[in-house]
Amino acid sequence: ELKEMLLKKYSGCLSRLRSEFLKKRKKGKLPKDARSALMDWWNTHYRWPYPTEEDKVRLAAMTGLDPKQINNWFINQRKRHWKPS
């Protein structure tokens, strides 16, 4: 009885929390066309691969990614593949 009452009262919260946890666990590659657009920018600006805020907004609109995803991609790309010259 108590269990049913609690489930009825908090089922909305529980399902929102469950979906939030599932989102956070989801990892994977970015879409191929988005990666391609980011790599094009990277290859063009390899000597100084720090996009401006305007570049990031344009890339986000072009790729359909969040600005945070764009930012993280560049951070990771520089860390893994860039040797300042």
Swiss-Prot record:
GO terms for molecular function: DNA binding; DNA-binding transcription factor activity, RNA polymerase II-specific. Pfam families: ELK (PF03789), Homeobox_KN (PF05920). One of its GO terms (cellular component) is nucleus. The keyword Nucleus applies. SUPFAM superfamilies: Homeodomain-like. It is found in: Nucleus. Residues 1-21 form the ELK domain. Strongly expressed in ear inflorescence primordia and shoot meristem. Weakly expressed in embryos. Absent from leaves. Keywords: DNA-binding, Homeobox, Nucleus. Residues 22-85 bind DNA. Belongs to the TALE/KNOX homeobox family. Probably binds to the DNA sequence 5'-TGAC-3'. PANTHER family: HOMEOBOX PROTEIN TRANSCRIPTION FACTORS. This is Homeobox protein knotted-1-like 5. The lineage of its organism: Eukaryota, Viridiplantae, Streptophyta, Embryophyta, Tracheophyta. The gene is KNOX5.
